[in-house]
Design a protein with these regions (language model features):
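Conserved serine/cysteine hydrolase catalytic core
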Residues: 165, 175-241, 249, 258
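Conserved alpha/beta-hydrolase catalytic His-Asp/Glu region
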Residues: 140-194
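Active-site loop/oxyanion-hole signature of alpha/beta-hydrolase fold enzymes
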Residues: 43-84
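Conserved hydrolase catalytic core segment
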Residues: 79-123
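Short beta-to-alpha linker loops that shape the active-site pocket of alpha/beta-hydrolase fold enzymes
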Residues: 46-50, 113, 253-254
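Conserved HGGG/HGGXW glycine-rich cap/lid loop of the alpha/beta-hydrolase fold
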Residues: 7-55
Length: 276
């Protein structure tokens, strides 16, 4: 029996879709997408070390997460399903497709799943902070009230002018503990371990090269702090690593709003309809 906490959106008899969230995210990241795909059964687990799965031991990388998801799909008896992964979830989705091709019919990678450019001169122990910066620092902070944590996100550069009810619910779900010692659910240990798999590990490069199913990638042109360039500023110029991968830029979004707002989620939904 799977140990992961799982949220499902949509009808139980809908066409199944496995949705894999990012490195400090949770199953609540898919609320906007679910509205755009009302006929689909969106299966959205909290990965170990995040959300309501935070008490599980941290993963040992993307392939560990993939094994968790394979166990979940086997338990649900879904057969092969399309898988959408956002940010780190894209890496997990690639690992799942490589390990269990019988469970994955197609991939959609949302600003993730392609190796990140390794910062020059950065040691393995510092990789998480080099990529996530203030995001990683957020995990060690405490918040006196739920409203204080909402205010953190309201002021975040990524959400300027984009705050909505989904984001409020997303922020609320992310908190654990009791006031005045509320903290984000994602554990620092989980982030540190998983960050090592984001820079072109041998297994990841082999998994991409071996993909035989559709694997489009949607790129956000702006990053975690709404800065130009995003996580993949030079992606169009980088060599293709997967024979079935196409790259499409999604206009006017950043790494968060490509999924967590209605305009971005609508484009993600359109891409899912193509591969389902």
């Amino acid at each position: 029996m799977t140990l992961l906490h799982v949220t499902e959106y949509g009808p139980r008899d809908g066409a199944p879709l496995l949705a894999v969230h990012g490195i400090t995210s949770s199953s609540r990241a898919w609320a906007a997408l679910a509205r755009h795909l009302p006929d689909m059964r969106i299966i959205a687990p909290d990965l170990r070390g995040r959300g309501r799965s935070r008490a599980l031991p941290p993963s040992t990388g993307m392939r560990h997460h993939a094994a968790d998801l394979a166990e979940l799909l086997e338990e649900l008896g879904t057969g092969a399903v399309p898988v959408v992964g956002h940010s780190m979830g894209g890496f997990v989705a690639v690992a799942l497709a490589a390990a269990r091709p019988d469970l994955v019919s197609a991939l959609l990678l949302v600003d993730g799943g392609y190796p990140l450019a390794r910062p020059a001169g950065v040691a393995d122990a510092d990789l998480a902070d080099a990529v996530l910066g203030p995001v990683a620092q957020r995990l060690s902070q405490e918040y006196p009230t739920v409203e204080a944590y909402r205010d953190f996100w309201r002021r975040h550069p990524a959400f300027a002018g984009a705050w909505n009810a989904d984001l409020e619910a997303y922020a609320d779900y992310d908190l654990v503990g009791e006031p005045p010692h509320l903290r984000p659910a994602s554990t620092v240990e989980a982030i540190a371990e998983d960050s090592l798999d984001l820079y072109g590990s041998d297994w990841h490069l082999a998994a991409l090269a071996g993909l035989g199913i559709p694997a489009p990638l949607l790129r956000a042109p702006r990053g975690l702090l709404d800065e130009p360039g995003g996580l993949y500023p030079d992606l169009p110029a980088r060599p293709p690593l997967a024979p079935t991968m196409t790259v499409t830029d999604v206009p006017d979004v950043n790494h968060y709003t490509i999924l967590l707002t209605d305009p971005g989620a609508g484009i993600v939904a359109d891409a899912i309809r193509v591969i389902r």
